[in-house]
Amino acid sequence: MDYHIEMLSGCPALYLPAVRRLIIMALLGLPLLSCTPAWQQPIAPENISFLSRSETQTHDDISVTVAVPSEEETQQLFGTNLYKSRVQPVWISVENRTQQGLTLMRNAVDDAYISPAEAAFLRHAGPRQADREMDLFFQAAEFKNPVPPGEIVNGYIFTNIDEGFKNINVDLLSDAALFNFVFTVMIPGLNTGMEYVDLDQLYTAIENVTATEDLQARLQDEACCTTNQKGTATGDPLNIVFIGERSAIMSAMIRRGWHVTEINHMKSALKTTRSFVFGRQYLYSPISPLYHYGRSQDLGLQKARQSVSRRNHIRLWLAPYRFRDMDVFLGQISRDIGVAFFKNTLTTHTIDPYVDHTRDGLVGDLAYSQNLSGVGYVAGSQVSTEVDTHYNLTPDPYYSDGYRAVFFFSEETTPLDEIDHIMWLPQWHPGLQPNVE
C-alpha cells in the first residue's frame, strides 16, 4: 500500500490511507516515528513545588533529604522530558555534622543508575550548541562526592523510572563506618485507586482494640471471603491481615518489589493489551474489584512476573478497628498463573488453586523487607478441600486450611532472626506447631 511522509514542524509524520492499520498500531503501542523536542531553558528548583514533598531522616549526626520530581516537574527542572526515556532524577541532600568525610554510594540508590552524560544524550535533539549546553547542565546537576565534615551537598542521581512509589536506599561511607538511610516516597502521576480513597474518612468512629485475645476474636469473626458487588456470592478467601502504621506497610511492600495498581481506564487498557499480546511486564496493571465491608478494595498491589497474565496480587481493606493504635487491614492474596477464556467475560485470570502456598510465600517474601516484626496465624478464612471444594467468582476452585496469616509491621529495622513467630492459641497454624516428643 502506498504511503507518503510529510514534514510537520521539523518532525516526520507518517500517513496511511488505512485507518484500521493506524488504530491497530496505536493499540499495540508501535510509534510511527518520534521526534524529541529541542532542549528548553530549565526552571530553578526553588520555583517548583517538588521539594515540598521531600522527606528527611537524621541519625549519627547526618541528615539526608530526598525528593523525586514528577514527570511534569522533571520537564521543568531539566528542560526535557526524561520520563519519556525512562530516566527518573532523584534529588538527594546530605548534611554532614560528623568529623569525617562521607561518600554517597550511587549504586545503592540504583545499581543500574544512569550517568549525567547518558541521560542528556538520550534527550539530544539539536542543534549541537544546545546539546552541549544540556550536557554541561546535567553534569552540574549530579550529586558530587565527597561530603566534607560540616558541609551540605545536594544534587541528583539519575535512576531508572518507578511509578506510584519509589524505594530509595542511601548509603554513606566514611573511613570508619557505613551509614544507611531508607526512604519510600510517593510519586505523583500514576492513576491509582489510592487517589480516590481517603482512609482517614472511611469511618466516623473507630475502635482501638488493646487485648490480643480480643483482636484474635475480631479477626476470626470477620467474613471468610470477599464477595461480588451485591454481596450475593462469595469470592476469593480473605487470607491475610496487615497490622501496623501505613508507612511501615508500604515501605515493606515497595522494598520487596510490590507495586500499586492503576485503575481501569483507556491508557491502562492499552498497556494491559500490549503486555498480554507481547508477553511484556506491566508492573501497575489494574486488578478487578472484589468487595468487603460493602466496598471494593481500598488498596491494590501486585508483583508482576513476565507478563500481565502471571502475577501475584493483593487487595486490602481498612478495618473499622485498630490494634494498639495501629491500622488493621483485612486482605486477600492470590497468584495468577494464566488466562482462561469465557463466553461472558471473554478472558479472565486463572489462579493457583493452592492459595495457602501463595499466602505462606508472602511470609517469606516480606521477611526480607526488614519491616516485618511478627507473623502469626488465626482462623476465620474459608476451609476448602478436595472433598468440599469452594470457588471464587471466576469461578476457579481453591484449596485452603482456612487460616489467615497475620503480619505485624514496624518502622524499626527487624532482621530475619528477630521476627517474632507468634504461637496464637488455641488455633495455631499446623505448620507452626512445635515438635512434641
Place the predicted regions along the sequence by residue:
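C-terminal motif of bacterial Sec signal peptides marking the signal peptidase cleavage site
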Residues: 33-34
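Low-complexity, acidic Ser/Thr/Pro/Gly-rich terminal tails and inter-domain linkers that flank the onset
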Residues: 44-83
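Short, solvent-exposed beta-strand/turn "edge" segments of beta-rich domains on protein surfaces
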Residues: 74-91, 97-101, 146-148, 230-231
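A cross-kingdom signal targeting lumenal/periplasmic-facing segments of multi-pass membrane
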Residues: 88, 95, 266-435
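The feature marks short-to-medium sequence segments in extracytoplasmic or secretory-pathway proteins
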Residues: 97-148, 153
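Short, hydrophobic/aromatic beta-strand segments
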Residues: 100-108, 168-170, 250-255
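Surface-exposed edge beta-strand/loop patches
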Residues: 141-206
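Terminal, regulation- and interaction-focused segments at domain boundaries
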Residues: 222-251
